[in-house]
Amino acid sequence: MFFFKGVVAVLSFFSAVNAAPFMKPNNGTGKYIPDSYIVLLKRDISHDDFELHKRWASDVHKRDVAKRGISFSGIGHSWATGSFRGYSGVFSRDTIEEIMKHEHVAHVERDQIGTSQGWVTQPKAPNWGLGRLSNSNPGNTDYTYDEGAGGNAVVYVIDSGIDTMHPEFQGRATWGANFIDKNNVDCWGHGTHCAGIIGSVTFGVAKRAAMIAVKVLDCNGQGPYSAFIAGLHWATEHAQKNGHIGRAIINFSLGGDNSPAVNQALEEAQKAGIFVSAAAGNFGSDAGSITPGGARLVCVIGNSDERDYRWTGQGPSNFGARVDIFAPGTDIMSTLPGGGSGVMTGTSMAAPHVAGQAAIQVSISGGGFDLSVACAFFKNSASASVKNPGPNTTNKLLVNGANGTKGPKQDENKPNKPPGQDEQPGQNKPPSQNPPPGQNPPPGQNPPPEQPAPSPPANPGDEPNPDGQPYPGDQPNPGDSGPSWWMPSGGLQPPAWWNRRPSFGGWNRPMWWNRPLSVWKL
């Protein structure tokens, strides 16, 4: 998972005269981009007022640049989804102070960059996570799932991109938007791995779901919060314009220091009717203290291992009241760019399991499943539990209702085989092995008593403003109460080639294509 290791402390609000609140990082290892800001406007302004404000801000910026004789790029991304309106940009100190004073501005924060927390741990391993979804007890590697396999759902993967040419995706993965560079390739691998868990033929939960790549991370696994917001806005708007609402899902395996701006963008997507599955984070600390756990409406997913323990090894799963449910996320085999596969561990791998199951529910219902209550549905129907969830944390573990699990209901009388692949010999899972010392306990042993994990390490200090002055917002103003949202109280059709008779681009449709259900041994 991609996270800024740290917790943002929200200082008292700074203002000159009715200035917007400004959130400054107090500690943490987040990388803050010089002179780069995210600006949110008040919810009650009209679209016309928003456009007028942007023109005004651009004029202020141009005048200041001309006066100073220096170069700042000004407004970059902007977004307007429902009542969520704002923009990001690179501004001088004087310009951002003028913007903060404007009557329409609700919040300003500095833009920042995060890095990867996922890693490949071994070259080859069986994917146990699918079998865990459809069986009452751990250890069974048969994966039983509904015949629809997510075929009328669309999943937006907001990440490092997707290798859309990977044969595991069978043409169901496409490029949507790129907010980080001009290269529509996944040069980091994290997004392709997440997409494979969602919908690849071999490793995926929903083997017929469509996936759309929204790239917000570069080849080093880094991306600014402003790109995260732009990606969320694009996905929400795309789903609305293309009739995907009610069938649309977002996988958000990203995060970091708590950001009201990113949290609000996540909540706006959920309010629009899109189910958002978000990774809880890999710090072994309270998920509610960071983004996306600070977004109250999204479904926050913790990482469980093969023995149904919360993962407490390297990159331990976060816990706390904002974790909604656990899902498999430890040593998960999935797709990698270039047609390959590999293993990663983290809540980044857990969230796509839930996104994939949401796609399955869409296909079970024929598009009539209410995605706004999907998270509660998964929690209430979970029959499995995590043995050491952590302080003040649910123990619910995702299941899909097959083979005697309680879970979301489906027709359990039909056998099931995945589209695109017959059962392969030699794929059965080898006997489980005990983890290395210091990781989760082997079967038959109780876990150590739960202790709240320490907070992420503190940053030695926030970098100084290049002009030698404090950043706007460094001085508190106890009188500012903050914005009102600070304490938040049509469908996709299968592609034309799907029902095409014997061939597609030289690829012959196999005999199992129209079979109802199958059982796949991993």
Curated annotation (Swiss-Prot):
Residues 36-113 form the Inhibitor I9 domain. It is found in: Secreted. Its EC number is 3.4.21.-. Residues 383-515 are annotated as: Disordered. It holds the Pfam family Inhibitor_I9. The keyword Glycoprotein applies. Residues 1-19 form the signal peptide. Residues 127-405 form the Peptidase S8 domain. Residues 432-459 have a biased composition (Pro residues). Gene3D superfamilies: Peptidase S8 propeptide/proteinase inhibitor I9, Peptidase S8/S53 domain. Its main location: secreted. Residues 383-397 have a biased composition (Polar residues). GO terms for cellular component: extracellular region. Residues 20-117 form a propeptide. Keywords: Glycoprotein, Hydrolase, Protease, Secreted, Serine protease, Signal, Virulence, Zymogen. The active site is at residues 159, 190, 348. Glycans are attached at residues 251, 392, 403. GO terms for biological process: proteolysis. It comes from the Eukaryota. GO terms for molecular function: serine-type endopeptidase activity. InterPro entries: PCSK9_ProteinaseK-like, Peptidase_S8/S53_dom, Peptidase_S8/S53_dom_sf, Peptidase_S8_Asp-AS, Peptidase_S8_His-AS, Peptidase_S8_Ser-AS, Peptidase_S8_subtilisin-like, Peptidase_S8_subtilisin-rel. Belongs to the peptidase S8 family. Secreted subtilisin-like serine protease with keratinolytic activity that contributes to pathogenicity. This is Subtilisin-like protease 10. It comes from Trichophyton verrucosum (strain HKI 0517). The gene is SUB10.
